[in-house]
Regions:
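Charged, low-complexity intrinsically disordered terminal segments
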Residues: 32-135, 139-420
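Bacterial N-terminal signal peptides
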Residues: 17-30
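Intrinsic-disorder/low-complexity regions
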Residues: 1-4, 30, 293
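Bacterial N-terminal signal peptides that target proteins for export
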Residues: 2-20
């Protein structure tokens, strides 16, 4: 080989090595955004005929349908209940689940047994279909509360959780906030919770006490998810009740209080209900209340929207007292009725989220009452990301600045609103 050919050979070999090195660095340097399969969406349900319809966030119905329609192996749903009516949008979800089962996807559903026994039985539409199994979890017997979580997982990797029940009204007549995360570690953590509750449907506690927990995503082991829209997002889930959480899972209530306690500048909170009520008439639940007052006393600006369904008995006095604190502003939200007439159990802000400072966001199924943390199954995702925080800030102020919210008047006598 002459010098010229040898030199060309060396150049070609060098270029090939550089190419291999670049590919190696892309794949293994930790910069997963380029080829990342992770996805994040903040998902909103909007009551029709309201100013909230200006939101450009993905709608719950569309996100759920996409998740189910793209599922290849499994769909696991844990929800408080199903409520469908002929011609309403939940029919599309039920049809999608049937179609998924028809193409071989294994569908499992957990619903609360107590609510099912006394209320809507729309989940029965899926009974007896090949590849679909439905179980009822006796949460009242297990922990004294209800299975109040609203989450599902497609293919063990694509997770949705939030305030949305599998209720047709939660798709078009109730304000809801949820989050979809496609990430294998988050999917695995939620899937293990589902497997535990699947066993608990049969009163089998083995799943709680004998579970390997080294891979769970939690407050001490958060995951960083790469998203085209939001960039790098650090996140972890938290669950209730602690007594029925597997070892290694974070507690919702503890994380909630910690975030409030660590807040330095602001808290924007939108919550369906808030109450000091406990099982004992002599004891009031004031852990969140004390944390909010403490935050306000150190200069944190606190704004809260409660739905008008929070107006009941002593809860109203509790809210009035909180609103009298310096640095705390509270409004009640009253969604206008639908033009076609009154719809029971609808036209309400059912959201359960808040943001802290400019980076922490909380999206949950828990209302702010003791039983939701101590006795009921609920799920939350906590994120650390400025863009998600900004997204939820927009959601908050669309309600805060709307014509259907008004500041709490401590001198006014409020009456409970009609629900059904």
């Amino acid at each position: 080989m002459n010098n010229k050919n040898y030199f060309s050979f060396l150049i070609t070999k060098f270029r090939f090595k550089i190419f291999v090195l670049i590919i190696f660095l892309i794949l293994f340097s930790g910069n997963t955004q380029i080829f990342s399969q992770d996805e994040i969406e903040i998902v909103e349900s909007i009551p029709l005929e309201t100013s909230l319809e200006n939101s450009d966030l993905p709608r719950t119905l569309n996100v759920w349908l996409k998740m189910i329609n793209e599922a290849k192996e499994s769909v696991d749903i844990e929800t408080f209940y199903f409520a469908n009516e002929k011609g309403k949008p939940l029919e599309q979800i039920i049809a999608a689940l049937k179609d998924a089962a028809g193409r071989g996807v294994i569908v499992r559903i957990i619903a609360d047994s107590g609510f099912y026994s006394k209320n809507d039985k729309s989940v029965d539409e899926l009974e007896g279909i090949k590849n679909i199994t439905i179980k009822k979890i006796p949460f009242s017997n297990l922990a004294g509360g209800v299975m109040h979580a609203k989450y599902f997982i497609a293919d063990k990797i694509n997770v949705f959780t939030g305030s949305q029940n599998f209720d047709w009204r939660a798709l078009i007549h109730i304000h809801e906030i949820g989050i979809r995360v496609k990430n294998k570690d988050m999917g695995r953590t939620f899937s293990e919770l589902f497997e535990t509750d699947w066993k608990l449907c049969d009163n089998n506690f083995y799943g709680i006490t004998n579970m390997a927990v080294h891979f769970f995503v939690n407050k001490d082991n958060p995951v960083t998810v790469s998203s085209d829209k939001y960039g790098q997002v650090m996140m972890y889930p938290a669950f209730s009740p602690p007594d029925l959480n597997m070892p290694g899972l974070s507690s919702e209530e503890d994380e909630l209080i910690k975030i409030i306690d660590y807040s330095k500048n602001r808290l924007l909170i939108q919550m369906y209900s808030y109450s000091p009520k406990t099982r004992s008439k002599e004891i009031k639940y004031d852990r969140i209340d004390n944390a909010l007052r403490s935050a306000a006393s150190r200069g944190v600006k606190v704004k809260i929207i409660f739905s008008d369904w929070a107006i009941r008995d002593e809860a109203t006095d509790f809210i009035k007292s909180l609103s009298a604190e310096k640095n705390i502003e509270i409004k009640f939200s009253s969604i206008p009725q639908y033009s076609a007439g009154f719809i029971p159990y609808s036209r309400v802000e059912h959201c359960k989220y808040f943001i802290s400072d400019n980076n922490i966001s909380w999206i949950s199924s828990s209302n702010w009452e003791q039983s939701y943390f101590s006795n009921s199954r609920n799920a939350t995702i906590v994120t650390d990301n400025i863009r998600i925080n900004e997204e939820l800030e927009k959601v908050f102020y669309r309600s805060w600045d709307s014509n259907f919210t008004e500041k709490v008047d401590i001198d006014r006598k409020y009456e409970s609103v009609k629900r059904n």
